[in-house]
């Protein structure tokens, strides 16, 4: 039994996904994230600092001062950038924009996991599917699930994946 599990996890069976298929994986990951909390799109609203700080600062002071203003000692660039860009939309759509950008950021690690840059690290395609499903269905993630305030955790994961991944050819 253990040998079967080992061969499943570490065999070198890899399916190379074309660019089109990577985008399909990305879209499927976004769909799973939205389905986990459907109110992200059916009843969008700001979450925590999304409205009170990121959107409000960009609204009151403009997008550039908002981007370069540190909060608690560091720059929250992505949060402030999304807050600034959201002013190009009608006010009623700003929370939806925040939520959709957060969903896209949350889905990025799944797409990157299936890219060819992770061929040597995780050669088994099925193991990548298992990892992606674990990542997408992690329990008790309501605090960080699809909001810009906590998007930096998923961006940190992407950074690690880029650092450990192979160079593109």
Model-derived regions: residue spans:
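Transmembrane-helix motifs of polytopic, lipid-linked glycan transferases
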Residues: 100-123
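Membrane-interfacial loop-to-transmembrane alpha-helix junctions, especially the N-terminal start
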Residues: 22-23, 68-72, 121-130
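Membrane-interface transmembrane helices that cradle and orient dolichyl/undecaprenyl
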Residues: 155, 160-169
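Membrane-embedded helix bundles of polyisoprenyl
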Residues: 127-142
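Start-transfer (signal-anchor) and selected internal transmembrane alpha helices
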Residues: 1-33
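Short hydrophobic/aromatic helix or loop-helix immediately within or flanking a transmembrane segment
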Residues: 52-58, 68-96, 100
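Multi-pass, polyprenyl lipid-linked donor-dependent membrane glycosyltransferases
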Residues: 141-159
């Amino acid at each position: 039994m253990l040998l079967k599990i080992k061969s499943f996890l570490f065999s070198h069976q890899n399916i190379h996904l074309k660019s089109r298929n990577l985008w399909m994986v990305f879209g499927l990951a976004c769909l799973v994230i939205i389905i986990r909390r459907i109110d992200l799109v059916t009843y969008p609203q700001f979450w925590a600092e999304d409205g009170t700080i990121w959107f409000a600062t960009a609204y009151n002071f403009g997008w550039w001062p908002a981007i370069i203003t540190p909060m608690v000692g560091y720059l929250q660039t992505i949060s402030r950038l999304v807050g600034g860009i959201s002013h190009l939309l009608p006010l009623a759509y700003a929370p939806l924009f925040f939520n959709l950008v957060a969903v896209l950021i949350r889905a990025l690690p799944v797409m990157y996991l299936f890219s060819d840059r992770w061929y040597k690290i995780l050669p088994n395609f099925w193991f990548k599917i298992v990892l992606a499903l674990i990542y997408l269905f992690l329990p008790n993630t309501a605090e960080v699930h699809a909001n810009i305030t906590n998007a930096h955790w998923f961006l940190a994961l992407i950074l690690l994946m880029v650092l450990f991944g192979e160079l593109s050819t």
